[in-house]
């Protein structure tokens, strides 16, 4: 079953340098499940560590994502490198190949479980909003945001917004989640997500 519509064929991707880091901006015309999962996967596969990220859905379903990224190998982000990232995103957005097939192209990706600083995972339904809140504090490592978004995708959860920041090797991620149009997550689902996250953090 196709998860992404034809509107995903068109999106804007741009970047600007910021010291040793880069500001990467992605604008997508329609919010659909799996966007963040695919974007974080491609950046990780291309050797980019996400230092900060802000994902937001604004009016008319337009999605604007901002990433602060840094190369894991010390290379520069060039127009050619950006074009490769864009091509891979387009292939995933159009579902020319599956996420699993794509990640299998990169068998040497360093998905490692840290041994220090036990993670803190807090997931709850506040009464003030019609979304579920997920807060995570854990040791940073390459591909972490991709792994988190992968779990949420597998639970068929829509990520409305994310704020991700890394300070002194510790990442603090805050997500707004929901199912369908305005459905908060059930207690059972929240517990399953929490346990799945603790297994990989």
Regions found by a protein language model. Name each.
Residues 1-201:
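Regulatory modules associated with amino-acid/nitrogen control
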